[in-house]
């Protein structure tokens, strides 16, 4: 039991002794890949005016770098350290395979990967196969470099994007016009450098054109509706004017009818008053006629009665003439009333 307890401690101590005193320092620093800053926002204007013919490929260090040595034999894989293994618990000796191998220092610089921006170098006519040279001066294919990955950047002739269609759409629609801050020539150059961005710009332009067409159609429909409403308002205003004229005419006629009615009422009142006056006079005459005693055959009495009767007839004729001159209908004379009485 004691030997099994000391085994793991001895293993840990032996690992600590084999550890280096200071961490390994890399001689060469890591170069930042051009694919990370190739299409930055600050230098996009310079990239659009980029001329591939100005590149000096002889000055590139990754083309003249010697190939790394190839390992002929594979290193034996280190067996994982097990604290609870039977060998360490029983013997207390650390097996040689359980020690981690020392890291080997690697001398060399980071080579830029062609997988991220290989489309750009394909347009320039530069591939990694042409610039991998051996010591004898012969050019041959290197097997130790990173191969191009179609999953990251795709081919230029893939179905997702077609530069020819972009160039045709640019030359057909937007030639001579500047939309979204970029002309057709610069967009064509951008299509060669960054196809995805050019495709996105074209999609935005098409979407803006469609929205503009929808806006124009909607504005035209609104204008037609406004014109229709204006015509209806004009027709209704004419009808309202006609109705107002009819109403004013009816009001005038109503006033005339009211005036005629008032005149008729006044005439009726005058007739009633005249009838009352005649009736009172008739009653008075009846009373007077009843109070006169009958004569004894004297001619004086008859002459007096005839003179009174002629005076009454003259009074009735005068009243009839006055009524006819005023436009009132003629009324029966007092003689008629006396005869009827």
Swiss-Prot record:
| Region described as Leucine-zipper: spans on this chain | 222-257
- List, alphabetically, the SMART domains matched: BRLZ
Q: Where is this region: Basic motif?
A: 196-217
| Source superkingdom | Eukaryota
Provide the protein's localization.
Answer: Cytoplasm; Nucleus
What does the UniProt PTM comment say about this protein? Phosphorylated by MPK3. This phosphorylation promotes nuclear localization.
Q: Where is the composition biased (Polar residues)?
A: 307-331
A Gene Ontology biological process in which this protein takes part is:
thigmotropism
Residue ranges of the region described as Involved in homomultimerization and histone H2A binding: 163-341
Q: Which PANTHER family match?
A: TRANSCRIPTION FACTOR POSF21-RELATED (PTHR13690), TRANSCRIPTION FACTOR VIP1 (PTHR13690:SF86)
Q: How does it assemble?
A: Forms homomultimers. Interacts with Agrobacterium tumefaciens VirE2 and mediates its translocation to the host nucleus. Binds to VIP2. Forms a complex made of Agrobacterium VirE2, VIP1, VIP2 and single-stranded DNA (ssDNA). The interaction with KAP1 mediates its nuclear import. Binds to the H2A histone RAT5. Interacts with MPK3 and Agrobacterium virF. Forms a complex made of VIP1, VBF and Agrobacterium virE2. Interacts with SCF(VBF) E3 ubiquitin ligase complex. Binds directly to VBF. Forms heterodimers with BZIP34 and BZIP61.
Family, according to the entry, reads as follows: Belongs to the bZIP family.
Record's protein name? Transcription factor VIP1
């Amino acid at each position: 039991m004691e030997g099994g307890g000391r085994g793991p401690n001895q293993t840990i101590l032996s690992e600590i002794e084999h550890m280096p005193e200071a961490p390994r320092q890399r001689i060469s620093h890591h170069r930042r890949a051009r694919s990370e800053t190739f299409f930055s926002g600050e230098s996009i204007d310079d990239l659009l005016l980029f001329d591939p013919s100005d590149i000096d490929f002889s000055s590139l260090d990754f083309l003249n770098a010697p190939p790394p040595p190839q390992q002929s034999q594979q290193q034996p894989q280190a067996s994982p350290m097990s604290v609870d293994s039977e060998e360490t618990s029983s013997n207390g000796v650390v097996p040689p395979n359980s020690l981690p191998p020392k890291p080997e220092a690697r001398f060399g610089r980071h080579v830029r990967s062609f997988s991220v921006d290989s489309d750009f170098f394909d347009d320039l006519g530069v591939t990694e196969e042409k610039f991998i040279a051996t010591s004898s001066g012969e050019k041959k294919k290197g097997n130790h470099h990173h191969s191009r990955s179609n999953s990251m950047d795709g081919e230029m002739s893939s179905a997702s994007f077609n530069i020819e269609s972009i160039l045709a759409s640019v030359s057909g629609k937007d030639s001579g016009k500047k939309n979204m801050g970029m002309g057709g020539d610069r967009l064509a150059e951008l299509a060669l450098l960054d196809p995805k961005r050019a495709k996105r710009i074209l999609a935005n332009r098409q979407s803006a054109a469609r929205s503009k067409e929808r806006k124009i159609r909607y504005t035209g429909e609104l204008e037609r509706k406004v014109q229709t409403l204006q015509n209806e308002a004009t027709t209704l205003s004419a009808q309202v004017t006609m109705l107002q004229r009819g109403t004013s005419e009816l009001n005038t006629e109503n006033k005339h009818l009211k005036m005629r009615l008032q005149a008729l009422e006044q005439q009726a009142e005058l007739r009633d008053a005249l009838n009352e006056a005649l009736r009172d006079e008739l009653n008075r005459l009846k009373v007077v006629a009843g109070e006169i005693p009958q004569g004894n055959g004297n001619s004086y009495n008859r002459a007096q009665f005839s003179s009174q009767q002629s005076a009454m007839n003259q009074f009735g004729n005068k009243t009839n003439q006055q009524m006819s001159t005023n436009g009132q209908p003629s009324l029966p004379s007092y003689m008629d009333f006396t005869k009827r009485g």
